[in-house]
Amino acid sequence: MAGGFLSMANPAVTLSGVAGNIISFLVFLAPVATFLQVYKKKSTGGYSSVPYVVALFSSVLWIFYALVKTNSRPLLTINAFGCGVEAAYIVLYLVYAPRRARLRTLAFFLLLDVAAFALIVVTTLYLVPKPHQVKFLGSVCLAFSMAVFVAPLSIIFKVIKTKSVEFMPIGLSVCLTLSAVAWFCYGLFTKDPYVMYPNVGGFFFSCVQMGLYFWYRKPRNTAVLPTTSDSMSPISAAAAATQRVIELPAGTHAFTILSVSPIPILGVHKVEVVAAEQAADGVAAAAAADKELLQNKPEVIEITAAV
């Protein structure tokens, strides 16, 4: 069986399929830490449901493709797992999200995961001739994969503009690179261009992210405390704040895409406003400290000796 999951007739297909499943399995579980926080706090905070709704759509789309094509068991297994995981994330989000966010999530879910997917299924099965169904559906999957590649561009531009890699975790980029390589090999060995081509883009963007990370990565700096001396004026607390590393909670990296190739997934992210607010809070705190320091500035007492 050419595309079988454990086909020994083509060990290369087996190895690439297994590797792709293992790496994608880990990527699907990446948001677990985020949702543990949501569960403990009983609140979604500033987290968005968009990545999980899009990831669910991606998984069901690739499952449908694997069923129409047949002999694509690696795609079936990992995307079936992905469907379950993403559905669990969405349910948990709906439980703890505020009413407005819950309604937006439900509307987006019905529009993308129900209406859009139903339209694709009906079109494929009833309007496209059977000999062309794989080509049509593969083209839809390919177009969707390329469309979501717009997401990494935003984070790449942000890193270049700010010269900061706070929003781009290196571990995720490494996993995505390995995943893209594994799924590219699977598409190559099974002669499936619809699996192979998206991974070229996934590999490229992952390598760019890793390159930017090492280019702009800076060693962790320690905050400089305001001090005084005989020959120096008090160091500005605001200036010291510029050397301080602002710790961001887990999940605050902005809209990073997980191009786990035949399964483009949008990664965990938190609204960037949250990070901006934290930075603003840090500056405000530094300004307050500066003001307090100036108010408590030690007086210089001149002692004149009588001659």
Swiss-Prot record:
Pfam families per UniProt: MtN3_slv
Induction data: By the X.oryzae pv. oryzae (Xoo) transcription activator-like effector (TALe) protein pthXo1 and, possibly, AvrXa7.
Span of domain MtN3/slv: 17-100, 136-219
Top-level taxon in the UniProt lineage: Eukaryota
Statement: the UniProt record of this protein carries the keyword Membrane: yes
UniProt keyword annotations, A-Z: Cell membrane, Membrane, Plant defense, Repeat, Sugar transport, Transmembrane, Transmembrane helix, Transport
Subcellular location: Cell membrane
Annotated GO biological process: carbohydrate transport; copper ion transport; defense response; sucrose transport
GO molecular function, one term: sucrose transmembrane transporter activity
Tissue occurrence: Mostly expressed in panicles and anthers. Also detected in leaves (leaf collar, leaf auricle, leaf ligule), roots, sheaths, culms and culm nodes.
Disruption outcome: Reduced starch content in pollen and male sterility. Enhanced resistance against bacterial blight mediated by X.oryzae pv. oryzae (Xoo) strain PXO99(A).
Transmembrane annotation, as ranges: 15-35, 48-68, 75-95, 108-128, 136-156, 169-189, 195-215
Protein topology in the membrane: Multi-pass membrane protein
Extracellular face of the membrane: 1-14, 69-74, 129-135, 190-194
GO cellular component, one term: plasma membrane
PANTHER family: BIDIRECTIONAL SUGAR TRANSPORTER SWEET11 (PTHR10791:SF196), RAG1-ACTIVATING PROTEIN 1 (PTHR10791)
Quaternary data: Interacts with COPT1 and COPT2. Interacts with APX8.
Protein name, entry field: Bidirectional sugar transporter SWEET11
Organism: Oryza sativa subsp. japonica (Rice)
Gene that encodes it: SWEET11
